[in-house]
Amino acid sequence: MFVIKFGGSLIKNPETIKKIFKEIENLDEFLIVPGGGEFADLVLKYYETHNLNLKISHDACILAMDIVGMILSNFTKIKASYELKKNIIFLPSKFLFNSE
């Protein structure tokens, strides 16, 4: 199985996303893990400028990964899911929050 980290910054370019997904869709088994992109960057900025709590900032960055994953699912037939299984865009928040 391929585990693919899909950088959140890629959501700026829909054509690139479509090309990447065209290749991924040909794989037999994969798991896509989205990055947080600009959403996570904004959380980190607020962490620094607004003196946010570290745990709250960390959790918000995980939620940013979910947001990017949902946006990515718009460009492919691959479904976004909170369930850790093959051939999905993994939304990690529930898995990570439940493991704390």
Regions found by a protein language model. Name each.
Residues 1-100:
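Nucleotide/pyrophosphate-binding catalytic subdomain
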